[in-house]
């Protein structure tokens, strides 16, 4: 039985090394695959019962493990929707059948509908822009779509304009003014209306404010500012109702509260008016915190989604599926969601990709070792076969 056992063990060793060569071949083939996780063949011995004075050789068992938790290198790309994770966590993606998986392969691009999909055909899932981390569930995530609607026109209705008017200014001659500033507002079609705001000193602590349409010089709003003679703080007259109705707009409430009359130059500390022209989307950025931000032609930015990350207690125990995606299992533990840079998750890096964690030099070394071991095991089988042939021929 020992010669049969010797041959059986040799075959077992060859099969084991063949498995190792297969994983090495996979690793080498996927050395440039985004998000690929290295496979490794692990060995364990199988001991068979033996009797006193007679050894019954056993065999070797193999098991394939993946280095899912080992991060690969990160390289830069030119696409803002190429995403890599620096640290813990996995992207949550949806397959063609609607099932959800985890992955580190972040080569996402918009499809014809604007949905972000990676090279393996899995769609990136995200949470709402205002979603709280504590309320995250996989079922509550949606496919990230970057075809944001164009910003509509919005007429101006409110603004804040805060200035300092020099206390040393003198009242100008009739028809004159001391200071002038131009502000931009919008009518309901999103067309610009330039407002000229004139400040004219009319008394020791009194100023007249006149708002005119710069296009035709028509006065469309006025107020009188009164300041405290001791502190220079505004006492009354801090609101101007600017009537844009004749120009296709609404009444704009221009707030001058916080303005002062003190020594120094004429300065502006705040000048903001709401409203906007219609604007189409220019591009999409993704922040380290997972915020997917639409950038519009007029410079406006709007958060569309927040990309959560997922993790499990034992990532290396997840089931590997084609396409560099992973399926949580009972051995890996339950999925836990959180936003990047919090909840123990890493950060998302836009314009980068995580490379394969397979090292070509190490794989070639492993291949040579497996080749030598395979050859040695074949020699064991060959020797056992030759000895068996000697035994069979003893009767001749």
Curated annotation (Swiss-Prot):
Effects seen without this gene: A flgE mutant is attenuated in a murine model of infection. Four weeks after infection, the number of cfu per spleen from mice infected with the mutant is significantly lower than the number from mice infected with the wild-type.
InterPro entries in UniProt: Falgellar_hook_FlgE_sf, Flag_bb_rod_N, Flagellar_basal_body_rod_CS, Flagellar_FlgE/F/G, Flg_bb/hook_C_dom, FlgE/F/G-like, FlgE_D2, LlgE_F_G-like_D1
SUPFAM superfamilies: Flagellar hook protein flgE
Cellular component terms per the entry's GO annotation: bacterial-type flagellum basal body; bacterial-type flagellum hook; cytosol
Main localization category: other
Cellular compartment(s): Bacterial flagellum basal body
Keywords of the record: Bacterial flagellum
Superkingdom assignment: Bacteria
Pfam families, alphabetized: Flg_bb_rod, Flg_bbr_C, FlgE_D2, LlgE_F_G_D1
Swiss-Prot/TrEMBL induction comment: Expressed at the onset of the exponential phase (after 4, 8 and 12 hours of culture) but not at later time points.
One BP term from GO: bacterial-type flagellum-dependent swarming motility
Primary role: The flagellum is required to cause a persistent disease in a murine model of infection.
NCBIfam families: FlgEFG_subfam
Similarity comment: Belongs to the flagella basal body rod proteins family.
Designated name of the protein: Flagellar hook protein FlgE
Gene: flgE
